[in-house]
Amino acid sequence: MRAVFRRVGGLLAFLAAVVLPFGGAAWGEAGPSVAAASDLKFALDEIATRFRQQTGNAVRLTYGSSGNFYRQIQQGAPFELFLSADEDYVRRLANEGLTVDGGERYATGRIVLFVPKGSTVKADPAFADLRAALGDGRLRRLAIANPEHAPYGRAAQQALVHEKLWAALSTRLVLGENVSQAAQFAVSGSAQAGIFALSLALSPDFAGKGDYVLIPEGWHEPLRQRAVLLRRSGATARALHLFLQQPPAREVFRRYGFVLPGE
């Protein structure tokens, strides 16, 4: 992309890459390493806790952008299970012989327009006030994930293109390294609004911190999310992969706004 972006948090992203060379923030003390898209942060934390309670097995969760994980897995990152926010990355890894099989779709995600408390921009599903705020100067910065490697960032870009706002907003974007960072930019007031995952807007950390509206599904390509076992996967990773498809995990995904296969 040739658009000029406002990049915030570059130093933090660099430090994260140094401390955790194969991903972003990690959760869990032991067990197999799991690479998970950032939109899963709260849902998967709950699911991993339930999995440990039922099986006694812990897993190490690392959250980040799916595109970055794709490249890291290609380069030999020691993950056993990959939960991608874009199933195309899983297909590519499968074609390259780096997975056990083609994986399983576990959910389809949704995106929201979020405005933090104190923002003069209003959340409306038609982007009417977003467009007006762009014209009258109320909207100085809009937070999204980086479309170059974050599926939720691409969906945000597609929604803005659909509404013919992308060109006008391209110099006002605050790009998160992943969708979770973009959400933090929005909720912290670093931007007057943000477009990010519904699953994050529904999390306890965001309760009471702003307003949001669902963005129509037709404004962007479906966020079909797929999990796949990698070649190095062991028994615990395989058990977690199966657990993701069971009712306890599906209930958590549903509560965080994901659309589940078959529903």
Model-derived regions, located:
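Bacterial N-terminal signal peptides
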Residues: 9-23
